[in-house]
Swiss-Prot record:
Its EC number is 2.7.1.23. NAD(+) binds at residues 73-74, 147-148, 158, 175, 177, 188-193, 247. The lineage of its organism: Bacteria, Pseudomonadati, Pseudomonadota, Gammaproteobacteria, Enterobacterales. The keyword Nucleotide-binding applies. It comes from Photorhabdus laumondii subsp. laumondii (strain DSM 15139 / CIP 105565 / TT01). Its cofactor is a divalent metal cation. InterPro entries: ATP-NAD_kinase_N (IPR017438), ATP-NAD_kinase_PpnK-typ_C (IPR017437), NAD/diacylglycerol_kinase_sf (IPR016064), NADK (IPR002504). This is NAD kinase. PANTHER family: NAD KINASE (PTHR20275:SF0). GO terms for molecular function: ATP binding; metal ion binding; NAD binding; NAD+ kinase activity. Involved in the regulation of the intracellular balance of NAD and NADP, and is a key enzyme in the biosynthesis of NADP. Catalyzes specifically the phosphorylation on 2'-hydroxyl of the adenosine moiety of NAD to yield NADP. It is found in: Cytoplasm.
Length: 292
């Protein structure tokens, strides 16, 4: 039997009344069940909770043992990068569009969540990537990503030139619009749209997917998650950037390299007991339907 939970964190950045209603319903339901609840302070303000215990993601990560993220995949990615620093499990209620990482249907969320709170859930550890933009002798600029780190030009789309080193050995050079470096979690996101393979979440692997390469022979490359990737550039790299989960942007200056490796952090994602990854591919991405 999985451990049960005592303190529940409620997280989200709602844009729609339906999402706010879900936050409010969830808060009062958890309190009626006798749980200690800490809710995102901005959400508490938006729904008019005056006596609730509130905090930011850091406080929720430190105090709660389960965080319920209400929203879409973007909300989950933003919260997960912070919550992965702490010993806290995370589950999502989908109030977005695709909801690939947010398992719980808002119309049936309380029933599913009740089973989870009773200890009936599946554990899954998702690793993150760490991106460092660095120059010798200087402090690097660092961010993490759940889905992917993307190398791309800045404000104007154009072809860029770079070299890729894996474990400090030259692997390939490329002229393209950029490069997507994705985790198994991110293999069903931007990487998939660019022609990358689907990696099941239990794989310790990273996929490198070229973006519109100026060659007929370029193909996605899958490597061990234990490998490090170094991107080197010509002297004209002032308008290059790397973005993490399309939410954090690190500009690249002349003379700087980018190093991407597996982060020490991991996301403790949990799912309902009946969760099936391949069913998620089918329902969310309209993947192959069962024939018989």
């Amino acid at each position: 039997m999985n451990k049960k939970f005592k303190c529940i964190g409620i997280v989200g950045h709602p844009r729609h009344p339906e999402a706010l209603a879900t936050h409010e319903m969830l808060y009062h339901w958890l309190k009626s069940k006798g749980y200690s609840v800490i809710i995102d302070r901005q959400v508490a303000k938006d729904i008019g909770l005056k006596d609730a215990q509130t905090g930011g993601l850091t406080e929720i990560g430190k105090q709660a043992d389960l965080a319920v993220v209400v929203g879409g995949d973007g909300n989950m990615l933003g919260a997960a990068r912070v919550l992965s620093r702490y010993d806290i499990k995370v589950i999502g209620i989908n109030r977005g569009n695709l909801g690939f990482l947010t398992d719980l249907d808002p119309d049936n969320a309380l029933q599913q969540l009740s089973e989870v709170l009773d200890g009936e859930y599946r554990n899954e550890h998702r690793f993150l990537l760490e991106a460092q933009v660095r120059r010798n002798g200087q402090k690097p600029r660092i961010s993490t990503a759940i889905n992917e780190v993307v190398l791309h030009p800045g404000k104007v789309a154009h072809m860029i030139e770079f070299e890729v080193y894996i474990d400090e050995r030259f692997a390939f050079s490329q002229r393209s619009d950029g490069l997507i470096i994705a985790t198994p979690t991110g293999s069903t996101a931007y990487s998939l749209s660019a022609g990358g393979p689907i990696l099941t979440p239990n794989l310790d692997a990273i996929v490198l997917v070229p973006m519109f390469p100026h060659t007929l022979s370029s193909r996605p490359l899958v490597i061990s998650s234990e490998s490090s990737i170094r991107l080197k550039f010509s002297q004209n790299s002032n308008d290059y950037e790397v973005s993490c989960d399309s939410q954090i942007v690190l500009p690249i200056q002349d003379g700087e390299d980018v190093i991407i490796s597996r982060s020490k952090q991991k996301l403790n994602l949990i799912h309902p007991q009946d969760y099936n990854y391949f069913n998620t591919l089918s329902t969310k991405l309209s993947w192959s339907k069962k024939m018989f």
